[in-house]
Amino acid sequence: MAEEFVQQRLANNKVTIFVKFTCPFCRNALDILNKFSFKRGAYEIVDIKEFKPENELRDYFEQITGGRTVPRIFFGKTSIGGYSDLLEIDNMDALGDILSSIGVLRTC
């Protein structure tokens, strides 16, 4: 059930972030991603509270990404990790280039 929940969201979006809105790392990751202007339908924020039981979802995250914590961030079906991984990419000034290369950003 957790696999279906996650895979359905990954199939429909280029950038998907699984969050808990009470989590400060999730809010920080959203702040980074919200600096960019995404094409309609190319970015989805999924609150993991939508799925019960949450531990089953976290077990599935661990199975496919090696981590149970949120945020869990995917570009396409590829996990890029969590907040610290996103921050590292952003600090290298590579995030915009990566997002452009996968075709999720609006062009003026």
From Swiss-Prot:
Disulfide bonds join 23-26. GO terms for molecular function: glutathione disulfide oxidoreductase activity. Keywords: Disulfide bond, Electron transport, Redox-active center, Transport, Virion. It comes from the Viruses. GO terms for cellular component: virion component. Coiled coil: none annotated. It holds the Pfam family Glutaredoxin. Induction: Expressed in the intermediate phase of the viral replicative cycle. The keyword Disulfide bond applies. Has thioltransferase and dehydroascorbate reductase activities. This is Glutaredoxin-1.
